[in-house]
């Protein structure tokens, strides 16, 4: 039977090493299955997630207790299904790749990318807090950094940039709040959370904007 461990402790050197290898594998998968659109969106989110792991290791920050974090994580994760529904019914899988000069994703590819990701995110959280395999904080952090914070920033930016609704915009607004709450609980620092928001915006917004203009 799986039992939540209340005290997870800090990241160790091996956790960081394995997380780095995982980041390379995840990045390769994203580029393979999603091509340029995921290369300019998911990869920066992955790099920032890995940077937070190095930050936590350098500062020897203890991971939050299962009681304080796991229910919050899955409550916020439930919102992702609502967000996915909005993206699906409004044609995000068609509009998103077109921004970068790529062909629209098939329904099968779009659903596969999301369902595999959701499986990894949820299992990662469960395993971290039951088996203490702390290197699996990487997929958890990636969901928080890109799936929450990234969605809030990019969907808002695309709607502003195009002066109109962009698929997924409405439900993405919830992630401004959820992303801040979940990451600040995980890092135990509001300052680090705000800097993550700012850092993501400074890196990703120019990248996606210039890439879109180039292919326009």
PLM feature segments, named:
Residues 32-39, 156-166, 214-216:
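Membrane-interface helix caps and helix-loop-helix hairpins in membrane proteins
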Residues 178-216:
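Terminal transmembrane helical module of multi-pass membrane proteins
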Residues 2-22, 37-39:
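N-terminal membrane topogenic signal
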Residues 36, 58-70, 129-138, 185-196:
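Membrane-interface helix-boundary motifs at transmembrane edges
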Residues 45-57, 116-124, 173-185:
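Hydrophobic cores of alpha-helical transmembrane segments in multi-pass inner/ER membrane proteins
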Residues 100-113:
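Short aromatic-rich membrane-water interface segments that cap or initiate transmembrane helices
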Residues 40-42, 100-101, 160-174:
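Non-cytosolic membrane-interface motifs at loop->transmembrane helix junctions
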Residues 77-95:
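Transmembrane alpha-helix/helix-exit interface in multi-pass inner-membrane proteins
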């Amino acid at each position: 039977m799986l039992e939540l461990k209340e005290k997870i402790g800090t990241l160790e050197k091996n956790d960081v090493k394995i997380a780095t290898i995982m980041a390379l594998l995840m990045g390769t998968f994203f580029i393979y299955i999603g091509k340029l659109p995921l290369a300019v969106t998911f990869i920066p989110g992955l790099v920032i997630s890995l940077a937070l792991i190095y930050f936590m290791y350098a500062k020897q920050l203890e991971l939050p207790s299962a009681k304080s974090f796991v229910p919050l994580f899955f409550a916020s994760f439930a919102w992702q299904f609502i967000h996915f529904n909005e993206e699906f019914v409004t044609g995000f899988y068609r509009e998103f790749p077109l921004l970068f000069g790529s062909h629209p994703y098939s329904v099968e590819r779009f659903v596969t990318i999301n369902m595999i990701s959701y499986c990894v995110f949820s299992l990662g959280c469960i395993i971290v807090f039951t088996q203490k395999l702390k290197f699996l904080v990487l997929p958890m952090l990636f969901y928080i950094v890109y799936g929450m914070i990234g969605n809030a920033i990019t969907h808002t930016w695309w709607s502003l940039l195009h002066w109109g609704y962009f698929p997924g915009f409405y439900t993405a607004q919830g992630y401004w709040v959820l992303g801040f709450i979940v990451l600040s609980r995980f890092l135990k620092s509001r300052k680090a959370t705000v800097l993550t928001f700012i850092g993501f915006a400074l890196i990703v917004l120019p990248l996606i904007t210039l890439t879109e203009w180039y292919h326009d």
